[in-house]
Amino acid sequence: MNKDDDKEGLAMFSALIDGIKPITQNKRHFRTPIKTKQEIELKEQQLHANSYFSDTYQPLLPVQGPMRWLEEGVDSLELKRLRRGDYQPDLLLDLHGYRQSEAKLELAALIQACVKQQSLCCCIMHGYGSGILKQQVPMWLVQHPMVKAFHQAPKEWGGDAALLVLIDIGEQPHRR
């Protein structure tokens, strides 16, 4: 094929389609897709996780002994109850094998589920691993306004590979 053949072909094509008008669409009305409830909840979880949990914040947490933290204004007896295992966790979260970004979303979803289900205590199993989640999870928990306290879990709930977390569920009477 040379340039002359191309010009002839283009001229024939132009002659064939000359006078053709595009079809107007008058029968079908397209709607924008409606977001499902799950998509909306996922967006909210991502928003909560990003707004509550910063990777750069370094709270003052104990270096020696069991990992523990108590929000200012909360009775120290609550921390003792967590340590002894007086609170039975209603929800469990196993973070084994999760990346940090995934763990943040799961953590935000867990806290949201605790508030929604009126669960006062939950257990987060971060595992031993390389220690990344073991270090990050307490730092993230300190930043969330619904977390009242956490303590290294007793042996039956995972020992030093897990945390028992006390959640502020509002003005509900405490359950055990």
Curated annotation (Swiss-Prot):
InterPro entries hit by this protein: Smr_dom, Smr_dom_sf, SmrB-like
GO BP, one annotated term: rescue of stalled ribosome
EC class: hydrolase
Domain named Smr: residues: 93-168
Domain of life from the UniProt record: Bacteria
E.C. numbers: 3.1.-.-
Homology family: Belongs to the SmrB family.
Name this polypeptide is given: Ribosome rescue factor SmrB
Organism: Shewanella baltica (strain OS155 / ATCC BAA-1091)
